[in-house]
């Protein structure tokens, strides 16, 4: 895929994370896999395929219904990769393990970097680097829940 074709996937990728799950079949490969520690507490091996990705995104939006992402840097591309640095913000509505009830209604903001590999005009692999510590601190989480798949 060309650099410009890869760059064209950045906007729809952001829109997908902003909650437009209708984009999934258009931009995500059937055998998609994410290498990430989701803030929802599931392990990385559970994020395989389109439906798992939609479930992950839906889970995050259940905790932060007004969550929105903006791309701050990028897209940076080569023949088969797309990289973006983003900022996300939203209002916590409860449901995160370990977060105190007084965190409900709190505005949170955090950043991350996504590295994606493309194949056949779609996104096939995803490596996420999210500032989860900042997210947890803003919620007042004192003990981070164990994330399956890492050191277990």
Where are these regions (language model features)?
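C-terminal and inter-domain tail/linker signature
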Residues: 1-152
